[in-house]
Amino acid sequence: MITLGMEEEIQIIDDRGELVAHDFSADFVEATIPEGLMDKEIHRCVIETKTRVCQTVPELLSCVRLMRGQARRQAASQGQRILIAGVHPTSTWQQQPLHEGADFPHYASLIDEYRDVSRSALSFGMHLHLGFELGAPRMAIMNRLRHVLPEVLALSASSPFFEGRDTGLQSWRHSLLDRYPRMGTSDAWESEQHYQAHVDRLRAVGCLGEDQGLWQDIRLHHRYGTLEIRIMDTHPDPVRIGLIATLLKWEAETLQLEIRAGRQGPVWSRACIDENKWRARRHGLRAQWIDWNRDTVSDTPKHFERWWSRVAPRAKDPAERSYWERHLADALIQRTFADVLRQQALRLGDWKTTLQWMASLACDDAYVPQAAEALA
């Protein structure tokens, strides 16, 4: 049994659609409910939501929807709204207040160490936690789960614009985050003991605080013991989130079976994975993907068909398999939210209208998938 949990970083906007500081000194509107809890982040224009531990993907999506509703109500209590995307298209980081000073020692220490790297990393991700039973080969799974992280980045890509400019990328968010140390693609580790020994060394020489872990695209969480996948942009469509969670859960289950049967394949280097990560950041679901086991390149339909064939046997029944197969096919037709956002910005013609459209997608069950083939 693999359990699931989700964290989302949600943008707080004003009536113009621009990022705005939220007053976290005021009481949260039911900050902790059975489905999860809300928290602050380093930038005051962010609400972070955290679901409870979930047993299934449908349960996870129910909690994600309910936590987004909580964030909407929290924002509305101060006349604000929410927006869901990996980067805000127009707001500038220099204008965003931070949680700093003596009242926020954790964030103050980050700002003191990383300076404008932390101030300017105005990004919004979603983190999927996979929880394993005692004795599961978590590090062996993590080493190989790294291989498919660029694919889920492509499925989630939602940050083509930055400070009013089209960056030419599908996910600009990683251009902001990868400036941090101990960020990006994880190394492969021989064992959990070797991984923990490295973390302990970093703490001993002052690189990490006692309650800090690595910030890489996937990590063994230092408190929860989960595998935390951190590579994804936030995405307005809960169904796309469900597809990503399903693929990662089934891939982890497949890896666990292979490892226990002694059939695991080779572990790819960080350098090899970074090649596919760049392709995902640049081209999204139009990327040409490298299979480093074969040294071959394939287009997205063929590549994802091969991945689907690998993990689909993990479905609990034909109905579940058919449901997610249909949504994967839809995703490959619709392309990324970055594609759709570019198309809408061009069609609507100005940022104010585009931001209002984006905000409307964060309303309850308001997201209607749109194909973006015209931008090919």
Annotate the PLM regions:
Residues 55-124:
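Well-ordered mid-protein domain cores that form the structural environment of catalytic cofactors
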Residues 86-90, 134, 233-235:
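Active-site-proximal loop/turn and secondary-structure-junction residues that shape catalytic pockets
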Residues 105, 109-126, 130-186, 190:
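Metal-dependent DNA replication initiation modules
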Residues 38, 99-103, 156, 173, ...:
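Short alpha-helix boundary/capping motifs
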Residues 41-47, 80-92, 118-129, 159-160, ...:
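Core alpha/beta catalytic barrel or barrel-like domain that forms the active/cofactor pocket
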